[in-house]
Amino acid sequence: MAQAHLNPVIASHLVEIKAEENPDTRVYVFERGEHGEDVITYRDLHEKANRLARLLLEKGIKTGDTFGVFMRNYPEFVYSLVAGTTIGAIMVPIDPRSRGDRLKYLLTNSGAKAVIVSIECLEQLEEVLKDVPDLKFIAVAYQRDLGMPVSPKYHALNETLEKDTWETVDQMIMDVRQPMEIIYTSGTTGDPKGVAIRNNRTGLFNILNMIVWKYKKDDILYNGLSLTHGNAQAVTLFPALALGITAVFSPRFTKSRI
């Protein structure tokens, strides 16, 4: 039975509840083209996010700190989101096309103390590192289908996610008003503006589904937009998580895949 103190409005609490009730339910599928797909169950999501939460704590990231997530649509994006809500750290999703002044601005304006980056975005990050002195830690997610070499300068996130044993992290926040993310606007009329998204937004997404989307239990959702955008999270990521239906994600937007 799920622990009574868990609040399903908080994403990491919801994942823990679902992992106990329906551990093998396929909740997310990440397409890999000719390399197949990554299928993520509630158990996978809970365990790997918890491993990542432990890593963040060990690297000095604590409740209220911000950390960037800079990648295409990969499983590590969702692990990062759930890990952040586990410890009360605030995730800053960064569009994988960002570079130069825009990337530097997003990292400095948000006060990010760490970045979780996929390997194909690492070069863009390295170009601005000298101008982002407050970063404490960088973890790199290597994608098997890209075949890019491991950099010895940074922590390989894959090693953490694949651990057989780790010191589990208990849920560290209970206040649904605690910020979950800072999502930045496009900045078409000036610098991008950071919008704080509280944990109670998860509950609002569920209400939106009941009123607007009205997904059914046998529906399969598809998303080709970047998960760094609020629309992709509201329409596919969070509804699938709450309802136990499958959402399929493409790593990047291409018109030919729609």
Predicted feature residues:
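A short N-terminal helical cap/helix-turn-helix that marks the beginning
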Residues: 4-29, 47
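Conserved pre-ATP/AMP-binding loop-to-beta segment of ANL
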Residues: 8, 23-26, 139, 164-184, ...
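Conserved AMP-binding/adenylate-forming core of the ANL superfamily
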Residues: 24-74, 78, 82, 99-104, ...
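Conserved AMP-binding A3 loop
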Residues: 39-43, 180-205
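Structural core segment of the AMP-binding/adenylate-forming
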Residues: 58-59, 86-159
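A short helix-loop-beta submotif of the ANL/AMP-binding
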Residues: 65, 72-92, 96-100, 108-114, ...
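Conserved AMP-binding
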Residues: 71-74, 95, 215, 225-229
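Conserved AMP-binding/adenylation subdomain of ANL enzymes
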Residues: 203-220, 228-258
